[in-house]
């Protein structure tokens, strides 16, 4: 009877062959095992996350922005919560954010450095909050921003320094605020602006409206609703179309100082006041010294006159020329 194939081989070769076959079988088993699904990004507590870096924290009554955000989050939904303030670096741990939704919160305060680190953010929705003012430079770090909504707040003033230069911003929503005018230069920093929403604001028909009217005539496309925008005349209490005011209607308006000029005035005002005060004090001191000197001279003159009247000194008269005293003096 012939032996098996392994019995004919040397023991060392048989062992090597068995080990090789075992390795092949193990690799086949691993290859046929079901693959695991991709792991979702790190998710903030109480939020739900999905593939693609989306973190859904909507309607959870959150009082603040979650502190455990990660760089894996690309889209953050924080709408319909109770967030009342955005501190400095509120999203510093989520520097890869592309989409940020903060609608329907209780936002009243936004720090000037709240959005620092979000250089790639493209979409920001702050609508339906309680914002009355924003500090200068709030949106300056958001150089990639293409959509910004501030609708449904209580904003009464928007300075150019608040928005800053946003070269890629295409959509700006300012409707349903308390804006009566827009300062000159605010919209000039938005070269790519394609959609501008201005409805629902109490625009006032006065000189402060001139920058907005001028800009709307030069850029009719972004504000497609221009033909229906109305302003209120304070004196006549009538409504007028913003497009009904040409440049000639603002001839009586004096050009207001720019923000840079106002800053110079504010900076030099106290300095000039102190300089004027110092000059006045110096002149007062000089006049006081001159007056005192004149009074001293006057008192000296009066004193000499009194001495002459009480003890006159002078040459002897002709009547006393023959007296012994006079002769002795002359001798």
Swiss-Prot record:
GO cellular component, one term: voltage-gated potassium channel complex
Region ranges (Disordered): 310-331
Entry GO MF terms: potassium channel activator activity; potassium channel regulator activity; transmembrane transporter binding; voltage-gated potassium channel activity
Extracellular side: 27-261
Cytoplasmic side: 283-331
Keywords assigned by UniProt, alphabetized: Cell membrane, Cytoplasm, Cytoskeleton, Disulfide bond, Ion channel, Ion transport, Leucine-rich repeat, Membrane, Repeat, Signal, Transmembrane, Transmembrane helix, Transport
LRRNT domain: residues covered: 34-71
Assembly notes: Interacts with KCNMA1.
Name of the protein in question: Leucine-rich repeat-containing protein 26
Organism lineage: Eukaryota, Metazoa, Chordata, Craniata, Vertebrata
């Amino acid at each position: 009877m012939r032996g098996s194939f392994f019995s004919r081989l040397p023991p060392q070769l048989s062992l090597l062959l068995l080990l090789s076959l075992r390795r092949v079988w193990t690799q086949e088993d691993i290859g046929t095992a079901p693959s695991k699904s991709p792991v979702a990004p790190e998710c903030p507590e109480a939020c739900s996350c999905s593939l693609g870096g989306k973190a859904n924290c909507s309607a959870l009554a959150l009082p603040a922005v979650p502190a455990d955000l990660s760089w894996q989050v690309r889209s953050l939904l924080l709408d319909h919560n109770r967030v009342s303030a955005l501190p400095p670096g509120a999203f510093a741990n989520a520097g890869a954010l592309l989409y940020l939704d903060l609608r329907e919160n209780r936002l009243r305060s936004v720090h000037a450095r709240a959005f620092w680190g979000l250089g790639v953010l493209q979409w920001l929705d702050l609508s339906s909050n309680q914002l009355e003012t924003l500090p200068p430079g709030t949106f300056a770090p958001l150089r990639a921003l293409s959509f910004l909504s501030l609708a449904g707040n209580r904003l009464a003033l928007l300075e150019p320094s608040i928005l800053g230069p946003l070269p890629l911003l295409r959509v700006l929503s300012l409707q349903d605020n308390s804006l009566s005018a827009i300062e000159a230069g605010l919209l000039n920093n938005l070269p790519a602006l394609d959609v501008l929403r201005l409805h629902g604001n109490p625009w006032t028909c006065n000189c402060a409206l001139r920058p907005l009217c001028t800009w709307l005539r030069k850029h009719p496309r972004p504000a497609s609703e221009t033909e229906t925008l109305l302003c209120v005349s304070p004196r006549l209490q009538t409504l007028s179309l913003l497009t009904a005011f040409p440049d000639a209607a603002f001839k009586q308006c004096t050009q207001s100082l720019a923000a840079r000029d106002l800053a110079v005035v504010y900076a030099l005002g106290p300095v000039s006041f102190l300089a004027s005060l110092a000059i006045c004090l110096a002149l007062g001191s000089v006049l006081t010294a001159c007056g005192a000197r004149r009074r001293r001279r006057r008192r000296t003159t009066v004193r000499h006159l009194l001495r002459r009247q009480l003890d006159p000194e002078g040459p002897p008269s002709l009547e006393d020329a023959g007296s012994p005293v006079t002769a002795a003096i002359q001798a």
